[in-house]
């Protein structure tokens, strides 16, 4: 799998109070589907941020057959995204966090690959 086609979706994501509030107010499947769609969209963008100008949001809504007002509500009402109104860009702290961990893992793997592969496991000595 290519590196640019992956990110971790944590099992306890549904335990987040903001996610739970969004699902309660907007309907669980619909709200969670749009949230994950936005995460996937951000994952493909440089620095994991995208435009929240009206035209790109309308295009996104049309592509995924979702109401543009629902996208706007999820972006702005549930503290799941950081929206920079001045730059008209948005990002997801969740995605930033999981990608930081994943990118660090990739960096370590690349360094180990240059050294000849996986680091050797240290043998535990038997305690006497």
Language-model features, listed with the residues they occupy:
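Positively charged, structured surface patches that bind polyanionic biopolymers
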Residues: 1-103
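Basic DNA-binding region of bZIP-type proteins
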Residues: 95-125
